[in-house]
């Protein structure tokens, strides 16, 4: 295990040197090296210069390129951190020409045919090879046992085809050296939904996927009312002759990703054959039990996502990127970046601690232009992906280090003042971004979708009744910029703060359709930001172990790390301070709380405070104690729905099911792992004990997980 020595050496938290684990991750993931391994980025500042130059080169003249290179470098040095694909690949085309600067993509619709399934496997392989994560909806495939007339046989169902995607992802990521990332989403009303919920209980199955359910408001209402829930799949035109479409016991009408080949009404709803009904609460308990034990499936509130989507008039979102912060349409793509909030804290840990809002606003404005320029060097492998990002110019700016910043301002994460601070951070970022969206539109032109004309449909009138109140009728033409600025629920909220800005955006069009998103930021928080808290999270712990994939090792390696705020406190206040210290002179202040000190409801409250001003979504995990009561656990999800979230994820330490990336030392100390040897002998060891196996030293917990999940020796 790596050991880090820390000493008090500075009076400025911004001057704290990177800890060994941070430098190591930067070196392995983001530092540019030649094909022969020669180092090109000599320092992190060289990485910043490479990225700033690559993005400034998207400007039209030499004068603008030089001007914005200086501004971009200024912002990077003051806390703007582009996402991993940008930091790793921008300006690196000479050395890795086939890589992308885009983190997030979603597959095209997987059509219910062998050609459709295999076509999307091929496209996904190219996408993963380029370094992008990808999401898919698999509930577009007919249920297990359904008759396939062309083959004269019965289908094996969506889950069996997911196995093909899983193997493809593992193969591509193993060959490319970077682990592939995939999200599988699944409709709560699909006949195979229960098989989807149970899928990952099988050791080693679908481990290249995060799995999430598309939860509708209708389902949540059925749970609340203790009603039955129909499981149904669309009816094609041939099947329609065998059914009475007006019989509510046989057919229901619901939204579907596409209507090609299916029976469809004028309001856009698709006829679906009811295969069976189940008590909604029974299905709910099945979801909750799986999530309690295995932290999956995730919980995506899809109606909320589509209701709040800025592109509500031309998109029906059914999938997200692998971490869930970017709900995207078919072939959708989005670039990411995060602002390190700790960089704006002045006089931390004192009565005079304050946040520099003016500089934060300025960095957010400059960073918005920087991220907009990434569209020009996206490197996406598929033409449909490139067309989609060029048409809408979506990006997702978020922040990281919220928990660390709250500590440095002497607040407690989850307290009323921290909720107020979180909402203001998100609101100020949003306002800065839309101000820049207007300026960029005036300088460079709006996103092409803003200049398009859209025909008013029955579906649009159903979603936005105010269109009719404003005099629009079926068949009228309305510009994209008006539908975006006037009728997006999110932009209507922005108009409450700055109506003149939104009026101008409706008149001229914005440079992009979406601006904000909060990613988990795990590796950039640990590396470039010196282990500030991830994204919107509190610090997991102030001194803990992180399991990292190390090239050449057969299991994950445990690395010792310290939170940024602990390093800062030791530099500025007390060099002997450590968590759990018994000596009074070494204790930390009571506001130095961690994820385990935050209640699940406080996690939801923080997410809700930010979500009001985030136009995409938020990747966040509510940590739950191992002994947290199951009935209370279910309440987290109903509370998340009531608070207006777009999704919810929980994590409860359960070593029998899986080993997390971030691990508390005392959890390992208190957990016994049982190994059965070839001769039948049983050996029990604590999770944090070092044991030798296959010529290497491993922690017991990591070796157990690698053998159980089937990835031992395959990194």
Feature locations, PLM:
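Catalytic phosphate/nucleotide-handling subdomain of diverse soluble enzymes
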Residues: 409, 417-436, 528-551
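Acidic/polar, glycine-rich intrinsically disordered N-terminal extensions of enzymes
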Residues: 1-101, 250, 255-271, 284-291, ...
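Long, charged, mostly alpha-helical binding arms that flank functional sites
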Residues: 333-397, 407, 581-587
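Core structural elements
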Residues: 18-28, 73-94, 188-189, 368-377, ...
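Active-site-adjacent structural elements in folded domains
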Residues: 87-92, 357, 381-392, 405, ...
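Internal maturation/activation junctions in enzymes
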Residues: 234-235, 363-386, 412-521, 618
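Active-site cavity-forming subdomains of large catalytic enzyme subunits
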Residues: 7-16, 102-357, 380-384, 388, ...
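Catalytic alpha/beta core of large soluble enzyme barrels
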Residues: 22, 325-327, 371-376, 446, ...
